[in-house]
Amino acid sequence: MVSISLCMIVRNEEKVLGRCLSCVRGFADEIIIVDTGSTDRTKEIAFSFTDKVYDFKWKDDFAATRNFAFSRGTGDYLFWLDADDVIRQEEWRKLMDLKRRLDMERPDVVMMKYAVGYDGDGAPSFFFYRERLLRRCGKAVWKGRIHEAVEPFGNHDRAPESGDRGSG
């Protein structure tokens, strides 16, 4: 089965980081945490999940920070989440199916649902697709100081309704 490196950038995320990292157990084979200057327990929590916790001086550039995180990943694929992201149990099963499928299909980029709007009950109500899982090949380069994105490359696949941002 392919290996997946979760690459995250964090700062002062002690309230949500443990929940996020707990939901990727079994899916991510490696966890990379890049801390940009936390003053709370974020790094302590990160170290309870991985020994691959790096300091990165904040340069007011999200793309530079994500590129640094991706440069530390060693898996076949690089997966990114924000600390407030949650993968629900039913979505986790879909991700595991996707991981098995990657052995045969090998897309360069897997687009996943990304919730950005919520109703009054906190349920996700507005989505778009983002590049969430990228083959580690040197072409997965983040651009954009704010609202960073990976420049399109290679062949794309769309994951079946995988992952809700900040829900749960």
Where are these regions (language model features)?
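Extreme N-terminal starter segment of soluble prokaryotic enzymes
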Residues: 1-5
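A conserved acidic beta->alpha catalytic loop
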Residues: 23, 27, 35-44, 58
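Conserved donor nucleotide-binding strand/loop of the catalytic core
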Residues: 44-68, 72
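Acidic helix N-cap motif at the loop->helix transition within catalytic regions
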Residues: 15-18, 40-49
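Conserved beta-strand positions in the Rossmann-like core of class I SAM-dependent methyltransferases
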Residues: 32-35, 54
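Short, well-formed alpha-helical segments that are part of the catalytic scaffolds
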Residues: 7-30
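Catalytic-site signature of metal-activated, phosphate-bearing donor transferases
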Residues: 63-70, 77, 81, 87-168
